[in-house]
């Protein structure tokens, strides 16, 4: 049943698909045009196959029966001979608007062009379907539209602003068809044109841009007079109404449900000239008034308007002789309703019809400037509206206020002058010989700095600080940070004295300083206005710059001594060009030049700062903590002593002295540093010579094995009893193939037999022991990969002197021995292999077990037996 119901739907869709084909369209309704206008007929094609760009052929028939070729988009010889000349002149042309659309344009249509126009398209389809042409009828009407002005030639109207005027034009049509007329009034002023008011073909009014408000107020109107006259009425003319007025009439006809314009005509109606109103405003040019008196200015108006215009007068003030510049302000205003708007100190009065007075009471210096009188004439408009008909601004009236200027002098002197850097500087700026009242005048100061220059170049001044009329101090860029740090201090100790102090004068502060004292006069509104500036003479802050000189001489009172005696050295200091110096001393020792183990080593022993505080620097001999003394003998002399000298103390000793100069508070500034001549300690001995070497029977081991390293000491020269010598032994390692890394201390054994072992980050252990008198054994137990590298020992011998004291010899170092730690490949891979084999076996057995269980229980199929009939054989024997 369902299949039968769907058959009609399928048949309908099939028939629709079969009927679908090319569609050519032109306007369906008859096109009506007027002789002399342009005819445009569009044509388009849709639902076609083939290329996207289609070609079009146009044909014409006056009666609709036989068509003559008119134009083609693809065949040059298609048009008939009758239309070849019009095509060449461009009166007939085809304009493609899209790949599937084209327009036929016929300019200057004539009655002979009335008829039927056919648009056809050549076939590009696989099968011929649809329509390939379409026809539209065109009617050509005679020109029956008549448009003209009310008077010929067009008149020229000369008006003044505010006066009314009217313009008329006639328009009528004798068309046999039902048409509507539309009318537009347009004004031309130079190249620009503006629409004033329009009456559409639907009978609606549309004011032009800028005329909306005047149209709604009734100032601009459009109405008809009789059957064919249209009147434009303007109740009050404006300057913008000047220009040439045109009347543009268009004829419209209903076409395909819409209105189509079929022709348009324009005519010049009149030229309107708006004569500007004469308006001038005059004020006195220069006026002088004493401070505290009244300022009276008169503005006289001259105009040619005698109608009911109303003036609006505004008085404004500016510091500049140009009222258009920013900064001018309005003092008083009299509007067109004779209402005055002003401040309490300003009055505006109307003396007569052409004179207006401005009165400013209690004038002061701030009233000096330029005064302007601004006059506007307003004429009444429609519906109680007003519009401006004239405007004028007077020339400026210069007003000068004479007042008693404060009279005073300014002197600047330096109460403190620096002699060195970091000394304070103090300047005092005094105001003297004042001759004005204290109640109405106050003084402020500005401080300036100018750099010294040897050349004649002009140097600009830099602002240090400026004080406003309310005594608010503002810092300049040069002094802002130092003033915040308290280094620059600006103060006012008395009413007539301003002070500037530099707590710590630097070399950059040298130069010329001057002050500017400003007088401020109190105004009637209790504000203060600057009235005068007086400059002081500059004061030069300068001191000669000389290099600081510091000389240190060291001497040795007892030049000859033996080991175990006391070494004494004194350092004498002399300085120049350093202010109130204090000295800090550092005693330093250098290895002798002949000591090849460390030729550039410098050791700081003891120091004494500028406050006489003693500090041990790198003196690490625990047995001689009190063995060195540094003391201050005089302000410029220091003495260094070293008790119980040893052979290891040999070297060059110097005094490094630093001179310190005091700055603000308890701070000190480093002024200079100098090094003394060296004093040498040299022991001429014929004692033994010690050497150290490292030996290992196992330079290459497997990880986990024991590493043995022997530090062997040999003695050359005089034989010593084993009890007369002892050793401090330290083991170091550089864990790299080269010696590019810093050595790491492993373990040490001092001469008293105390062993110290450094902390390690891996599992191997260290042990250090003395095997014999001259042999020391370092053992690494359970060696790791990190234990590879260069190993060496450092030995410090101690020898007992004949007096029974122990003398420390120079430290010696052995040459390094490289130790390699290898990995045991069999042991490394034994357990991983066993674990892998075991896991593989377990996984294989488990896989077999899973397969067996799956095949036995999950995949077993039930087999049905075929029933067979079993019949016994019958015996063939016959009874």
Swiss-Prot record:
Keyword Cytoplasm included in the entry's annotation: no
Motif Endoplasmic reticulum retention signal mapped to chain: 424-427
Disulfide pairings: 43-119, 169-247, 299-373, 429-515, 571-655, 711-793
Motif Cell attachment site mapped to chain: 703-705
Domain spans labelled Ig-like C2-type: 26-129, 149-268, 276-394, 406-536, 544-662, 688-813
Superkingdom per UniProt: Eukaryota
Alphabetized Pfam families for the sequence: V-set
Gene Ontology CC: cell surface; endoplasmic reticulum membrane; Golgi apparatus; membrane
Residues carrying sugar: 44, 286, 300, 383, 413, 525, 600, 618, 691
Signal peptide: 1-25
Topological category with respect to the lipid bilayer: Single-pass type I membrane protein
Parts of the chain on the Extracellular side: 26-832
The keyword Endoplasmic reticulum is annotated on this UniProt entry: yes
Modification type Phosphothreonine: residues: 271
GO BP annotation list: lipid droplet organization; myoblast fusion involved in skeletal muscle regeneration
UniProt-listed PROSITE patterns: IG_LIKE
Main localization category: endoplasmic reticulum
Residues in the Cytoplasmic compartment per record: 854-879
Family annotation (InterPro entries): Ig-like_dom (IPR007110), Ig-like_dom_sf (IPR036179), Ig-like_fold (IPR013783), Ig_sub (IPR003599), Ig_V-set (IPR013106), IgSF_V-set/TM_domain (IPR051102)
Function of the protein: Inhibits the binding of prostaglandin F2-alpha (PGF2-alpha) to its specific FP receptor, by decreasing the receptor number rather than the affinity constant. Functional coupling with the prostaglandin F2-alpha receptor seems to occur. In myoblasts, associates with tetraspanins CD9 and CD81 to prevent myotube fusion during muscle regeneration.
Complexes and interactors: Interacts with CD9 and CD81. Part of a complex composed of CD9, CD81 and IGSF8. Also seems to interact with CD63, CD82 and CD151.
PANTHER family: PROSTAGLANDIN F2 RECEPTOR NEGATIVE REGULATOR (PTHR12207:SF3), V-SET AND TRANSMEMBRANE DOMAIN-CONTAINING PROTEIN (PTHR12207)
Protein name: Prostaglandin F2 receptor negative regulator
Organism of this sequence: Homo sapiens
Gene expressing this chain: PTGFRN
